Regions:
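Key DNA-contact positions within bacterial/archaeal DNA-binding proteins
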Residues: 33, 59
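Short capping segments at the starts of secondary-structure elements
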Residues: 42-46
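The alpha-helix within a helix-turn-helix
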Residues: 51
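Pre-recognition alpha-helix immediately N-terminal to the DNA-recognition helix
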Residues: 14, 18, 34-37, 95, ...
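N-terminal leader segment of winged-helix/HTH proteins
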Residues: 1-26, 73, 95
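C-terminal regulatory/oligomerization modules of transcriptional regulators
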Residues: 118-143
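Charged, amphipathic alpha-helical coiled-coil/dimerization segments
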Residues: 66-125
Length: 143
């Protein structure tokens, strides 16, 4: 289906812009939110864990974590290895997560209005398959 990527990228840009506007009240961007979301969902995490989850270079995640530390939303705790940096949410980070999660959930519900539940489920299941196909294609290229 030609034009799918263009449509998807247009939606993605609009969504990121909307999320950045929503999160700006907390001095956050979507990229910072991803770190908070990962830690809340997976518990204390290393920089490597977070960078692998989002397929982002470790130095990029390091900069995001430093910004969140400045905002007092995350802190480093000792890891198994002293070279390993483990990041966890602070009380403030958890509070902000709860507030933002509610707003993001409300946004999800509002943008899905008028779309049948079966169509929502189809999109929910199709997107990870596309991501997997892309990952497999990239993986096959390097072999």
């Amino acid at each position: 289906m030609e034009g799918f990527f263009q449509r998807y990228l247009s939606l993605y840009r609009s969504l990121i812009t909307t999320l950045n506007e929503l999160l700006s009240a907390y001095e956050l961007s979507y990229s910072l939110w991803q770190v908070i979301y990962h830690i809340k969902t997976n518990g204390p995490s290393t920089l490597v864990d977070i960078s692998a989850r989002y397929n982002v270079e470790k130095p990029t995640i390091t900069r995001r974590v430093h910004r969140l530390e400045e905002l007092q939303m995350v802190k480093q705790i000792p890891g198994k290895d002293r070279r390993e940096k483990v990041i966890q949410l602070t009380e403030l980070g958890d509070k902000i997560y709860q507030e933002c999660r509610k707003k993001i959930t409300d946004l999800e519900h509002s943008v899905m209005e008028g779309i049948a539940k079966d169509e929502q489920k189809a999109a929910f299941h199709i997107l990870p398959k596309i991501q997997e196909n892309l990952f497999n294609r990239e993986g096959n290229k390097s072999e």
